[in-house]
């Protein structure tokens, strides 16, 4: 205890003489380490009378705190000096060009959706959306596809239980819209749909867009004119287009639309038809007063045709070498 002040003075001198952080840490160990000079002073307390030990211990702790503060201050000085030296040694060539920030790009399917929404937006269509987890009423029953209908088997549906499913088409959005508002109705419904299928031209999840018009005096001629204009605008060519009879439970008459490819072969691009009277009745619209047409198309398929992509799965593999081609 008698030479405590001397130990503090010696520690202060050693701290001031430390030229780097490593040397400073050696001083810390020498005085405050497990076997350091000041730490060992605590062992002398056992030689003192019990009533003197608290005061003596406080003096030793104050000395240790004084040394610790000196260590902290010196460490801050050394670190600041080291930083100044490093900055002084470094040179920055301000004439060098900055690092280029690479801009991202839209996914090709997103480009297709935006392009189609823009076209139909100019015709007065609004975008409508709905849930991807659907019930069988909106996905099937209301669309004139009752439980016993063979068309249900064509959809390869992902079922959660007896009534809940991942929607196989965005047609449920049409049902919800017609239930929520009276004609005139003019909507497009883009979104993800799900079917249990996977190969070069099918994936379990894909994007679909459906369109719907319900009003008075809507005819198949209106449908043909609208889709003619759309396809020629989308592909930016004066395409040869044909409508061939088909069958969909929710439209009557129904048709599939083909375009002539560059190889001289017909390519199917979408399905369409006049809204079936049963569908209108299911949503409370009088088919004696109103009529309408609907169409549906796969976004990936149109994107493949527009950009010449041969494998549908390329859109979902997140390969930047592929995606950067569409920037």
Swiss-Prot record:
SUPFAM superfamilies: Class II aaRS and biotin synthetases, tRNA-binding arm. It comes from Salmonella newport (strain SL254). Its EC number is 6.1.1.20. Keywords: Aminoacyl-tRNA synthetase, ATP-binding, Cytoplasm, Ligase, Magnesium, Metal-binding, Nucleotide-binding, Protein biosynthesis. One of its GO terms (cellular component) is cytoplasm. Binds 2 magnesium ions per tetramer. PROSITE patterns: AA_TRNA_LIGASE_II. Belongs to the class-II aminoacyl-tRNA synthetase family. Phe-tRNA synthetase alpha subunit type 1 subfamily. This is Phenylalanine--tRNA ligase alpha subunit. Tetramer of two alpha and two beta subunits. It catalyses: tRNA(Phe) + L-phenylalanine + ATP = L-phenylalanyl-tRNA(Phe) + AMP + diphosphate + H(+). GO terms for molecular function: ATP binding; magnesium ion binding; phenylalanine-tRNA ligase activity; tRNA binding. Mg(2+) binds at residue 252. Its cofactor is Mg(2+). The keyword Hydrolase does not apply. Its main location: cytoplasm. The keyword Lipid metabolism does not apply. It is found in: Cytoplasm. GO terms for biological process: phenylalanyl-tRNA aminoacylation.
């Amino acid at each position: 205890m008698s030479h405590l002040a001397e130990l503090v003075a010696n520690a202060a001198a050693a701290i001031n003489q430390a030229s780097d952080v490593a040397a400073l840490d050696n001083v810390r160990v020498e005085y405050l380490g497990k076997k350091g000079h000041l730490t060992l002073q605590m062992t002398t307390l056992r030689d003192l009378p019990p009533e003197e030990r608290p005061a003596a211990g406080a003096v030793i702790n104050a000395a240790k705190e004084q040394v610790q503060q000196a260590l902290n201050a010196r460490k801050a000085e050394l670190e600041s000096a080291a930083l100044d030296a490093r900055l002084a040694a470094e040179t920055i060539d301000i004439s060098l060009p900055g690092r280029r920030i690479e801009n991202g790009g839209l996914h090709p399917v997103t480009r297709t959706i935006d392009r189609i929404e823009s076209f139909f937006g100019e015709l007065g269509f609004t975008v409508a959306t709905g849930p991807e987890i659907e019930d069988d009423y909106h996905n099937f029953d209301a669309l004139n596809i009752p439980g016993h209908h063979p068309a249900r088997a064509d959809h390869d549906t992902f079922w959660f239980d007896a009534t809940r499913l991942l929607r196989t088409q965005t047609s449920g959005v049409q049902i919800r819209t017609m239930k929520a508002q009276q004609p005139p109705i003019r909507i497009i419904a883009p979104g993800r749909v799900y079917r249990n299928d996977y190969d070069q031209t099918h994936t379990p999840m894909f994007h679909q867009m459906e369109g719907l018009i319900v009003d008075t005096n809507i005819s198949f001629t209106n449908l043909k004119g609208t889709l003619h204009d759309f396809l020629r605008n989308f592909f930016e060519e004066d395409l040869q287009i044909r409508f061939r009879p088909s069958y969909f439970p929710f439209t009557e008459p129904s048709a599939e639309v083909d375009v002539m490819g560059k190889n001289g072969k017909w390519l199917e691009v979408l399905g369409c038809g006049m809204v079936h009277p049963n569908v209108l009745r299911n949503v409370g619209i009088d088919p004696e007063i109103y009529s309408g047409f609907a169409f549906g198309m796969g976004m990936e398929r149109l994107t493949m045709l527009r950009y010449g992509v041969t494998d549908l799965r390329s859109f979902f593999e997140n390969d930047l070498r592929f995606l950067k081609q569409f920037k």
